[in-house]
Amino acid sequence: MAEFNGIRAIVTDIEGTTSSISFVHEVLFPYAAKHMDAFIRENFSAPAVAEQLDEVARLGGVDRKSPDALIKQLLDWIAEDKKITPLKALQGMIWRSGYDEGAYKGHVYPEVAERLRHWRELGIRLFVYSSGSVAAQKQIFGFSEAGDLTPLFSGYFDTRVGGKRDADSYRAIVREVSEPASSVLFLSDVPAELSAAAEAELQVCQLVRGAGIERQETYPAVASFADLLIKPA
């Protein structure tokens, strides 16, 4: 059990925190990789897709006019688990079709929905910060196994606000949330992200869900949202 006092807002990570790493790596990533080629070719000139392909060409140094080169770059980034904004945006577009077609539902750990509702009832605002695009974040919660959880959240942040291991990203989030940093709690399974948030003066807690997670000793850690005792300001 870990206790946190004076909390006005909670910012939560997704992968390894609200949702299993295996869902992302064994369901979502392969689905996007499988459908990337057809999606890019079918939507090559669509404005929303073209905007992201411009960035893929710029960041990857590949020929913007070549679907083959762009697709190869995107698939390479997926294989390397790169947190690159245009890749995440395009993955989100592909994942949406999977949700719409019922290919899968967004995984959330069993206690997550109840705890999120409880914190909202306490008057605490909830936010998401993930390397996945805002659209993908809304999908995993909007099409979750526990139903549509998006009404519980007040906002979403992705890599457009900055990298998750950069303290300035958390400072930017605090400005958007419009609460004192010390009244904002950040939840993540990744020690480097917790360190960056703590540097920005947020309260932090690590989620250690099962084996294979690097446990750090600097900050509080719990195995489940049910182990968090959060008292609002």
UniProtKB/Swiss-Prot annotation:
It catalyses: 5-methylsulfanyl-2,3-dioxopentyl phosphate + H2O = 1,2-dihydroxy-5-(methylsulfanyl)pent-1-en-3-one + phosphate. Its EC number is 3.1.3.77. One of its GO terms (biological process) is L-methionine salvage from methylthioadenosine. It is an enzyme of class 3 (hydrolase). Keywords: Amino-acid biosynthesis, Hydrolase, Magnesium, Metal-binding, Methionine biosynthesis. GO terms for molecular function: 2,3-diketo-5-methylthiopentyl-1-phosphate enolase activity; 2-hydroxy-3-keto-5-methylthiopentenyl-1-phosphate phosphatase activity; acireductone synthase activity; magnesium ion binding. Binds 1 Mg(2+) ion per subunit. Pathway: Amino-acid biosynthesis; L-methionine biosynthesis via salvage pathway; L-methionine from S-methyl-5-thio-alpha-D-ribose 1-phosphate: step 3/6; Amino-acid biosynthesis; L-methionine biosynthesis via salvage pathway; L-methionine from S-methyl-5-thio-alpha-D-ribose 1-phosphate: step 4/6. It comes from the Bacteria. Bifunctional enzyme that catalyzes the enolization of 2,3-diketo-5-methylthiopentyl-1-phosphate (DK-MTP-1-P) into the intermediate 2-hydroxy-3-keto-5-methylthiopentenyl-1-phosphate (HK-MTPenyl-1-P), which is then dephosphorylated to form the acireductone 1,2-dihydroxy-3-keto-5-methylthiopentene (DHK-MTPene). Monomer. Belongs to the HAD-like hydrolase superfamily. MasA/MtnC family. HAMAP family: Salvage_MtnC. NCBIfam families: enolase-ppase (TIGR01691). This is Enolase-phosphatase E1. The gene is mtnC.
